[in-house]
């Protein structure tokens, strides 16, 4: 039996719960993630993030102004030592509809990826294909994944450093074939909050023996970099995420996002700047000697030091 929480832990849990619910609710509202009548397929891996996502969505479901279904789905990828009983027991205790899928993607990954190489990319691609197909089978209108704000920021830096792209994880995504809408309700949540929440809630965490324990992954290096920034410069991570929500294509260099080629000056645009002040009289800028005796504030006068004549 799990140990009872202390009063201090209960207070902390309540505070965390309110914060996470508020952040998830804001993300759902900002990106219109869940609508009335939706059937949400909540993908459960057995990790802290997906447990927290399911827990918070179930709570919000009771208070939401719209009606929606939640169906939990886990994909058993046949990793050695995977405790098959853990998730069914947990989901039974919640008394919610769920499906456990079985597909041996583990063998495929081990066969295709040389020893010591990162397996995450192929593993996630195989898992995604299976889950997308199953979502269509059960009539799910949304697929909820447990990626949080740190995942989104890390992905942006990974794509910058190793892919040469300014690309991250969108909170809401339409699949390439247009058949599925993927949502990330934890998009505004910090990983450290989710870790603490999972610990206090005592979720039955299942570690990933295939990729989660591999060292020297590129993502881990980026995560370490961001954690160091967070320690040295509090608030920087929040600022980075805010910047990702406030892009200005016209101030960048991506010709696909902004039509720089067609930029033309407007010859009829009004003059702006100090010399355009309404209280300044019009004068000939080439009248260096000021023969018109116009009294101008020296700070606002253009000082023409030389005139070039062709």
From Swiss-Prot:
<dbReference type="Pfam" id="PF01171">
    <property type="entry name" value="ATP_bind_3"/>
</dbReference>
<comment type="subunit">
    <text>Homodimer.</text>
</comment>
<dbReference type="InterPro" id="IPR035107">
    <property type="entry name" value="tRNA_thiolation_TtcA_Ctu1"/>
</dbReference>
<keyword id="KW-0820">tRNA-binding</keyword>
<keyword id="KW-0411">Iron-sulfur</keyword>
<feature type="binding site">
    <location>
        <position position="120"/>
    </location>
    <ligand>
        <name>[4Fe-4S] cluster</name>
    </ligand>
</feature>
<comment type="function">
    <text>Catalyzes the ATP-dependent 2-thiolation of cytidine in position 32 of tRNA, to form 2-thiocytidine (s(2)C32). The sulfur atoms are provided by the cysteine/cysteine desulfurase (IscS) system.</text>
</comment>
<keyword id="KW-0004">4Fe-4S</keyword>
<keyword id="KW-0808">Transferase</keyword>
<dbReference type="GO" id="GO:0034227">
    <property type="term" value="P:tRNA thio-modification"/>
</dbReference>
<dbReference type="GO" id="GO:0000287">
    <property type="term" value="F:magnesium ion binding"/>
</dbReference>
<dbReference type="InterPro" id="IPR012089">
    <property type="entry name" value="tRNA_Cyd_32_2_STrfase"/>
</dbReference>
<keyword id="KW-0067">ATP-binding</keyword>
<dbReference type="GO" id="GO:0000049">
    <property type="term" value="F:tRNA binding"/>
</dbReference>
<keyword id="KW-0819">tRNA processing</keyword>
<protein>
    <recommendedName>
        <fullName>tRNA-cytidine(32) 2-sulfurtransferase</fullName>
        <ecNumber>2.8.1.-</ecNumber>
    </recommendedName>
</protein>
<comment type="pathway">
    <text>tRNA modification.</text>
</comment>
<dbReference type="GO" id="GO:0005737">
    <property type="term" value="C:cytoplasm"/>
</dbReference>
<dbReference type="GO" id="GO:0016783">
    <property type="term" value="F:sulfurtransferase activity"/>
</dbReference>
<keyword id="KW-0460">Magnesium</keyword>
<keyword id="KW-0547">Nucleotide-binding</keyword>
<dbReference type="InterPro" id="IPR011063">
    <property type="entry name" value="TilS/TtcA_N"/>
</dbReference>
<feature type="short sequence motif" description="PP-loop motif">
    <location>
        <begin position="45"/>
        <end position="50"/>
    </location>
</feature>
<dbReference type="GO" id="GO:0005524">
    <property type="term" value="F:ATP binding"/>
</dbReference>
<dbReference type="GO" id="GO:0051539">
    <property type="term" value="F:4 iron, 4 sulfur cluster binding"/>
</dbReference>
<feature type="binding site">
    <location>
        <position position="123"/>
    </location>
    <ligand>
        <name>[4Fe-4S] cluster</name>
    </ligand>
</feature>
<dbReference type="InterPro" id="IPR014729">
    <property type="entry name" value="Rossmann-like_a/b/a_fold"/>
</dbReference>
<keyword id="KW-0963">Cytoplasm</keyword>
<comment type="similarity">
    <text>Belongs to the TtcA family.</text>
</comment>
<keyword id="KW-0408">Iron</keyword>
<feature type="binding site">
    <location>
        <position position="211"/>
    </location>
    <ligand>
        <name>[4Fe-4S] cluster</name>
    </ligand>
</feature>
<keyword id="KW-0479">Metal-binding</keyword>
<keyword id="KW-0694">RNA-binding</keyword>
């Amino acid at each position: 039996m799990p140990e009872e929480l202390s009063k201090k832990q209960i207070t902390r849990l309540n505070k965390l719960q309110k914060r996470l619910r508020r952040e998830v609710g804001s993300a759902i509202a900002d990106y219109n993630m869940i609508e009335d009548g939706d059937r949400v397929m909540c993908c459960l891996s057995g990790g802290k993030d997906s447990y927290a996502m399911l827990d918070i969505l179930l709570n919000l479901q009771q208070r939401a102004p719209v009606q929606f279904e939640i169906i939990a789905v886990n994909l058993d990828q046949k990793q050695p030592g995977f405790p098959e009983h853990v998730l069914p027991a947990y989901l039974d205790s919640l008394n919610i509809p769920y499906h456990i899928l079985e597909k041996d993607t583990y063998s495929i990954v081990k066969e295709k990826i040389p020893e010591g190489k990162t397996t995450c990319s192929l593993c996630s691609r195989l898992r995604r294909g299976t889950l997308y197909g199953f979502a269509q089978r059960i009539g799910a209108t949304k697929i909820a994944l447990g990626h949080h704000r740190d995942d989104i920021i890390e992905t942006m830096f990974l794509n910058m450093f190793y892919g040469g792209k300014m690309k991250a994880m969108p909170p809401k995504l339409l699949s390439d074939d247009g058949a599925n809408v993927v949502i990330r309700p934890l998009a505004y949540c910090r990983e450290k909050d989710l870790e603490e929440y999972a610990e206090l809630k005592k979720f039955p965490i299942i570690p990933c023996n295939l990729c989660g324990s591999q060292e020297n992954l590129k993502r881990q290096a980026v995560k370490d970099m961001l954690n160091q920034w967070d320690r040295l410069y509090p608030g920087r991570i929040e600022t980075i995420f805010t910047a990702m929500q406030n892009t200005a294509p016209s101030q960048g260099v991506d010709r696909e996002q902004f039509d720089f080629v067609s930029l033309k000056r407007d010859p009829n645009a009004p003059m702006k700047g100090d010399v355009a002040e309404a209280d300044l009289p019009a004068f000939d800028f080439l009248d260096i000697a000021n023969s018109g005796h116009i009294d101008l504030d020296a700070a606002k006068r253009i000082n023409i030091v030389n005139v070039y004549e062709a």
